[in-house]
Swiss-Prot record:
Major transport protein for glucocorticoids and progestins in the blood of almost all vertebrate species. GO terms for molecular function: serine-type endopeptidase inhibitor activity; steroid binding. It holds the Pfam family Serpin. It comes from the Eukaryota. It is found in: Secreted. The keyword Glycoprotein applies. The record marks C242 as: Conserved cysteine within steroid binding domain. InterPro entries: Serpin_CS, Serpin_dom, Serpin_fam, Serpin_sf, Serpin_sf_1, Serpin_sf_2. Belongs to the serpin family. Proteolytic cleavage leads to an important conformation change. This reduces the affinity for steroids. This is Corticosteroid-binding globulin.
Length: 396
């Protein structure tokens, strides 16, 4: 299937609602009602976060955030979280939306065999609060989540419990969520995701070398730089000045590495949209390249209240929220935290796999070095969910 066709699926499910039956016209039409009217939800969210901290690494998982917002809407008297994701509740029922997220979660876990991905939501509430049984049953059924009672008055102990729970759920990959709470809360939702993949064409660890990464005009850091040569999907964009390549993971994961021209990061980020991805997909062609990509691990933590205040759902995270469908104790003050972690390395070498193409090719390859700030977009090709979006400013 071509990247252009995949882009059509992205148009239908930027917020992550697509099913295995999407290949048929009938099923496709049935899911158009679930597709958000704002198909650029993921890009808008990403662009906002980069604008807040343009000189820092940015990492989010749009599909994980979408699931968290949909889960919180269960039983809530307000529907702005679903509407902000683009759902028309006059055409699609809330039950259908939650069933689709349930199926999406299943598809991601079943289809991404080449990705080590731990994604989920954990709820923590005051010991004296009582959530309704119907709400607890729904979050477990649709989102495989649970609610744990802790003592927020002893915040040191409470934060340790939260961190340990997420550490256990991610098999030790995410060890720390947060230590401070900016404002009092009676209900904390932690949305987390860890991702690491196996490249379809893995890098050879023997070729990894220490090289310079130019953070800005005055700052340079040393990073382990992975190297391989071969035929890779490539495009040089003169309209939105950048170079980009696409690399697949084993299974259904795929990654777009986007290298803006000097001083053009803001221009390229502002141009990210469904139409831009569609255009790139049509113009990308295989090219012999010498590819240099830094090996790194980055993580980011966000207060969703700060992230979502421009998406018309900030009332969900304030004292004005009505969670009468969720708890017998209202009003309820909600804090939502998003924690994302990405590990990018050579990838485990599978039996019978090759460690990239030889470093010396007959034709003269193009050198592409990601040795300055770049953009990284990770998708699931089967559902075309936005797994990760990142601006990598300093991989050291």
């Amino acid at each position: 299937m071509s990247l252009a066709l995949y882009t059509c699926l992205l148009w239908l499910c930027t917020s992550g609602l697509w099913t295995a039956q999407a290949s048929t016209n009938e099923s496709s039409n049935s899911h158009r009602g679930l597709a958000p009217t704002n198909v650029d939800f993921a890009f808008n969210l990403y662009q906002r976060l980069v604008a807040l901290n343009p000189d820092k690494n940015t990492l989010i998982s749009p599909v994980s955030i979408s699931m968290a917002l949909a889960m919180v809407s269960l039983g809530s008297a307000q529907t702005q979280s679903l509407q902000s994701l683009g759902f028309n509740l006059t055409e699609t029922s809330e039950a259908e939306i939650h069933q689709s997220f349930q199926y999406l979660n299943y598809l991601l876990k079943q289809s991404d065999t080449g990705l080590e991905m731990n994604m989920g939501n954990a709820m923590f509430l005051l010991q004296k609060l009582k959530l309704k049984d119907s709400f607890l049953a729904d979050v477990k059924q649709y989102y495989e989540s649970e609610a744990l009672a802790i003592d927020f008055e002893d915040w040191t102990k409470a934060s340790q419990q939260i961190n340990q729970h997420v550490k256990d759920k991610t098999q030790g990959k995410i060890e720390h969520v947060f230590s401070d709470l900016d404002s009092p809360a009676s209900f904390i939702l932690v949305n987390y995701i860890f991702l690491r993949g196996i490249w379809e064409l893995p890098f050879s660890p023997e070729n990894t070398r220490e090289e310079d990464f130019y953070v800005n005009e005055t700052s340079t850091v040393k990073v382990p730089m992975m190297v391989q040569s071969g035929s890779i999907g490539y495009f040089r964009d003169s309209v939105f000045p950048c170079q980009l390549i696409q690399m697949d993971y084993v299974g259904n994961g795929t990654a777009f590495f986007i290298l803006p021209d000097q001083g053009q990061m803001d221009t390229v980020i502002a141009a990210l949209s469904r139409d831009t991805i569609d255009r790139w997909g049509k113009l990308m062609t295989p090219r012999q390249v010498n590819l240099y990509i830094p090996k790194f691990s980055i993580s980011d933590t966000y207060d969703l209240k700060d992230m979502l205040e421009d998406l018309n759902i900030k009332d969900l995270l304030t004292n004005q929220s009505d969670f009468s469908g969720n708890t017998k104790d209202v009003p309820l003050t909600l804090t939502m935290v998003h924690k994302a972690m990405l590990q990018l390395d050579e990838g485990n070498v599978l039996p019978n796999s090759t460690n990239g193409a030889p470093l010396h090719l007959r034709s003269e390859p193009l050198d592409i070095k990601f040795n300055k700030p770049f953009i990284l977009l990770l998708f699931d090709k089967f559902t075309w969910s936005s797994l990760m979006m990142s601006q990598v400013v300093n991989p050291a």
